[in-house]
Structure formats: C-alpha cells, structure tokens
Amino acid sequence: LLTRSMRSFGWRHGHAALVTSAAAGQTLEAISLGVDSTYQSTNGWRDWPTFMLLRPKPEYREKAAQAVAFANEHLAGIPYNLVAGIFTSKFQEAPGGTQCAHLVWEAYQSTGLDLDSDGGKIVTVKDLANSEYLDVVQVFGVDPEEIWP
C-alpha cells in the first residue's frame, strides 16, 4: 500500500506499508521517528485522500509470501531510521532500523526482487510506485496512467 498524501517540511514523500495479511487486514509499517515498526490495521488507509494498492507482477507473485515471512522475522519491532541505506548497507539480514519505503523494499529485496526503481541509496515511496516489478491493483485519488511522475 502506498499513498502520496504524506508531507514533511513541504516535501511530498508519501507513506508505504507492507500488507502482511490481506485476510486479517494487517500491515507492517515504519510510522515515524521514535516509533518502532509495528503492525497496523488496513482500516487506517481508508482515510488517506490518495492510495495505491500494488502487487508483484504475475511472474513474481510467489515472492510475496517470502517477503512477508522475512518482514515478520526481521523487520517488525525495529527502530525508525530515516536514513536507512545511507550510512549502512542498504540491505541487511538483521537491519538496525528502517523507514516506510525501505521496509517494503527490504522485504522484497530479501527474495532477490529489487523494487527500487532508480537504484539510489535511499528508497522512497515514489521509487516503489514506479517499480517495473509491480502491477497496479487499485488506486484512489491518483491517475492510474501516471502513478507518480
């Protein structure tokens, strides 16, 4: 799940979450500084003025369960780190911190699928939105032809 509707200091950076159980309506999210990554209800996503539901393209769908398993084991309950990937290796088997887009990226990177569309040191929500490995399932408040120009 992605939204374009999050801003800090005038920068529209968005927010990302990894759906860990569609049936239970559960996500794993890195919320903000000072808060460890935690499980949330998908109900909160109904309040965003924009959202994008993306999933791996058919040839990569089997990686979703592997990504969730990695996230449950390694990415839940870790500190928020706005600069994850800058001063440390971008991918770590046992990360010391993460931010929202990095959490989703790291879960899939553990399966060998690199969702970072520009390959930079920092993974952003825009990078995920523009990943060649993801299909759009549903959008609200976003042009499906131009997810995030």
Regions found by a protein language model. Give the residues of each.
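Glycine-rich catalytic cores of cysteine/serine-nucleophile enzymes that process amide/ester linkages
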Residues: 1-59, 83-95
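Long, low-complexity intrinsically disordered regions
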Residues: 52-109
